[in-house]
Amino acid sequence: MNFTRIHTSLLILAVLVLALGFTGCKSGGMSAQEGGGLSWKNKLKIADKFYKEGYFYDACHYYSEVLEEQPDNMDVTYKLAESYYLSRDYKEANENYKMVMDKNLVLYPMSHYKYALTLKMTGRYPEAKEEFAKFGKSYKGADANLQKKRVKNEILGCDYALEALGKPLNVVVIHMGNEINAAYTEASPMPVGADKLIYASLRSDTVIAFEDVKSRVGRFQLYQSVKTYNRWSQGELLPPEVNEPGMDVANGCYSPDKKRFFYTQCKSDKTGKMICSIFMSDFIDGKWKKAKKLDDKINMEGYTNTHPTVGKYKKGTQILYFVSDRPGAGGKDIWYSEISKDGVFKDPKNLGKKINTISDELTPFYNNESRVLYFSSNGHPGIGGYDVFSTEGRLRKWTKPENVGYPLNSSVDDMYFVADEDETGGYFIS
């Protein structure tokens, strides 16, 4: 699939909706009895716990309740804005960042940057450019040089967006439908042949009640859907050999020979930080074997390691590409490790600064036929937050990443792009 020649051939791309922002943080079926009787300080503790563990939908529900009693609390307002942002409700995030920026910019200088960013992510590109420029001139923090680089990148992204929107690609984007898209969120689609799709789903749209906070368990699980007569079935859970109880499980992919299945398990560490690790399950004679956690070379202790994709290499060996927040070029980077015929993983190496930026690179997918790596980044100039990019090569030798264009990329986050095996289409999350 070559997006530089996409205007000559029609591609059908199916989209799974990452719908956190559309469900709204203020609703979730929680009754007054469940949330009533708590002081605003206790609600704040609950909200902070959910935020720290990455459950932003639940966090913004409780932050909203705190602000009903403490409407002038800018610290909580900023946390609410962050929760809205991370749950993809960019309109509400924009309004709350603006409130903080207007009332206490000195204490929260980054609220100006996030205000500009959410203008961009709601498609208001001329306004966003203006606010980014203002922020770049006024910001005096210790990381001013870093923020100036980000501002320059975001302004380039706004310019690219205005150009790309006027030159849409010959692409049809199709919503996957309610059989797969749940009310809350889907992630990490992985086609298996022409008629199967493995994906992760958060099958819940309810806010966690106070009495359930201490026993909070992972809710992401891996599902498989089958297509019959052009209609996808309701997703069925993969077996417990993969979906370990009490874990958030996602980001599944097969090795090129379909004998191994790699995926991610996430849980909170002792400090409450969500840490993800990569696991592998052998798939033999149609049955799943008990999964094993990859060794410390891949799962570096104290860091998140996630989003695996596996490519072919020379003489029967393979390459694991994955994402980690271990020290590298910036925030989350894409790394690779060679896998020997005996299944031994070599020390991981960073893909390099041509791919990895000062910001984050996520959700890589390597196409073994075309040798194209697709990934999402918020560090290369883009239309929205995370855009999908493509680059040809392997290991540390890559062409300059290209933005795959509109309408695959939009003003919001577009991630988890994966091509069909016949390269006539693909799937992604938006």
PLM features per residue range, with description:
Residues 36-69:
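Alpha-helical segment of the N-proximal tetratricopeptide repeat
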Residues 26-29:
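Bacterial signal peptide processing site
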